[in-house]
Amino acid sequence: MQRTKKITAFVLAIALCVGMLQTLGVNAKAADTGKHMDVLFTHDTHSHLNSFPTIVDGKQEEVGGFARLKTLIDEQKEKNPDTLYLDGGDFSMGTLIQTVYETEAAELRMLGYLGCDVTTWGNHEFDYRSSGLANMLNTAKASGENVPSLVVCNVNWSAMEKAGLTEGQQQIK
């Protein structure tokens, strides 16, 4: 048993070292090209489109809000046009803005306004069930505004087809 543990530990150590060496080689190769990409990431914004007051270091301050985010994102994209902005989902449910989730798709449309390239669904995008999510997606699409691309997994494609939501979608197996 002891010998098996030692052999396993040795093999894992070698595998980790090889993995680190491969990573170092990739980073050096990327650095040689002179190309640089920045990635901005948000998640769990929960309908907080507006700023809100909170206590920071014992003082009340206005924090958050999509206007502040837009400023930071634009500044970063001005510094480096090769900036990718990703959102990890749960962009809805958390303020009264959620009450127009299905009819206005405010959160998803605002992510588009911010310049979000790609988002996904968190659990709160399903708070109004699949039909609410479908209504929100159709509303966002019908607005004609720029909305982020969506990446998802574990999707029932037959239900998506039935709801008419597969146009422009690609299933990767």
Protein language model regions, located:
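N-terminal cationic leader/targeting segments used for protein routing and processing
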Residues: 6-7, 28-30
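Bacterial N-terminal signal peptides that target proteins for export
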Residues: 1-11
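RTX-like calcium-binding, glycine/aspartate-rich low-complexity repeat tracts
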Residues: 23
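Cleavable N-terminal signal peptides
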Residues: 17, 26-28
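Hydrophobic core
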Residues: 12, 16-20
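Acidic, metal/ion-coordinating pockets
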Residues: 29-173
